[in-house]
Amino acid sequence: YICQNCGFSRPKLDYCLSDLTSITNTSANFVIDDANYQINVGGLYNIYNALAAVSVAEFFDIAPAVIEKGFQQSHAVFGRQETFKVGDKTCTLVLIKNPVGANQVLDMMKLAPYPFTLVTLLNANYADGIDTSWIWDADFELINALKVEHIITGGVRHSEMARRVRVSGFDENKISDSETLSDVLDLIEQQASDHVYILATYTAMLEMRDLLATRHYVNGEMK
């Protein structure tokens, strides 16, 4: 940006992503300051995170090869595109907690090349935020452009989440509203699609992970 009157303009960048080579729902390749990098998590928002990490590393004179090695040794962690198997289903668990974050995750799922079941878990505890009206500001209408075969809603505010996805225009005959997370997990196991995305608010994510650990789908550690 630049003002034609006073000359006020965007300052020269110290660190810059100059090329986005490829991006998928599980990885991205890009160029920062003439160095090639790859991260093993999906979505544009994680490239912003990577740019921040590279900027700090370069400030401390860490070589690009060392930075790239660090990226390759990192992996999706606790609730941040964490993947695990539920029976024969490949599940990805992603934390959502506000409209901007939810929209970024929906954009990331748009990159999935395969059909999937979408699970949305909405709680309203203090750690989640007791006001859940933010789901109406999130662009859940995007689900109609995704390869979603079925939606399962759960959590304390499961019925509100079900209403939100119905209002989005998604086929209500393909929405299952579940009162318990145990029922949600049972429904996941019954789905025809091989892939499942689970979007959960914070305490719903913790409760789901506890249930998954009880059934030995994940360990109980926050890695």
Placement of each model-derived feature along the sequence:
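Generic structural motif
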Residues: L20-I23, A35, L44, N98, ...
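A short glycine/serine-rich beta->alpha loop
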Residues: N36-L44, T90-T92
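ATP-dependent carboxylate-amine ligase
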Residues: Y1-L13, S55-I62, K69-K223
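Extended acidic/charged loop-beta regions that coordinate divalent cations
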Residues: Y1-N36
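Short glycine/threonine-rich catalytic loop with a Thr-x-Gly-x-Asp
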Residues: V41-A52, F78-G79
